[in-house]
Curated annotation (Swiss-Prot):
GO terms for biological process: ribosomal small subunit assembly; translation. The keyword Ribosomal protein applies. Coiled coil: none annotated. GO terms for molecular function: rRNA binding; structural constituent of ribosome. InterPro entries: Ribosomal_uS19, Ribosomal_uS19_bac-type, Ribosomal_uS19_CS, Ribosomal_uS19_SF. It comes from the Bacteria. One of its GO terms (cellular component) is small ribosomal subunit. Keywords: Ribonucleoprotein, Ribosomal protein, RNA-binding, rRNA-binding. This is Small ribosomal subunit protein uS19. Belongs to the universal ribosomal protein uS19 family. The keyword rRNA-binding applies.
Length: 91
């Protein structure tokens, strides 16, 4: 279910503070580490790189215009697929 329009998009305060600090300093190369997968990507995030935690390590996510409105967690998968098991009877 989508978030109510009257509430508006959500972003953690600590993440927004880190973004504002990075934009003010002009440091677009640094990776902003975050555990906040639930935060919505805002237009002022464009051009920044986030290290989004997937439960094991931080995955670098470079934000582009097409990502605005999505959540950070959508771009850092948490599960790895290794394929189905091989049938040992067929040899």
């Amino acid at each position: 279910m989508a978030r109510s329009l009257k509430k508006g998009p959500f972003c953690d305060h600590h993440l927004m503070a880190k973004v504002e600090e990075a934009v003010a300093s002009g440091n677009n190369k640094a990776v902003i580490k975050t555990w906040s997968r639930r935060s919505t990507i805002f237009p002022n995030f464009i051009g920044l790189t986030f290290g989004v935690y997937n439960g094991k390590k931080h995955i670098p996510v470079h934000v582009t215009e097409q990502m605005v409105g999505h959540k950070l967690g959508e771009f850092a998968p948490t599960r790895t697929y290794h394929g189905h098991g091989v049938d040992k009877k067929k040899k």
